[in-house]
């Protein structure tokens, strides 16, 4: 039995695919360039990014396994050369630079007109992967470590999310840059190295 998605979602899928193809040709290909004999695979990087953003946005899925399963079940007609979950996950993780570049371009492109260029707001918040008696976490071991959040008076194991945003009167700030760091790193050092 053929499983399909509604027409309005099909149009959004096409729009996302065309947008990602344009952005890939302009700049994203330089952030995930392939230097191998397999530089033109049957299942392209543009298709991986399209599935990731479309399913994440339309279906609100956050787990890569769920995104791949949805694509396998409902988007097979659109992506007949869909790779296995392991290959999809591996290739998506290798495109972190392209996702970072695409995010920064989208933040610049959709910047509201009422943003004040002369005033930016800088803030950070903890992303707690474990706290309490557990001294070490099992999530994101390569970047997570132990830190202290003075506003919550809390020792925790995890990461810090840093944001620089343009001030907007009467509205939440519009982010212009977002960065992750280990929990133990000083905010000032992160902003000097990552956000300036």
Regions found by a protein language model. Give the residues of each.
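Short alpha-helical elements
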Residues: 1-196
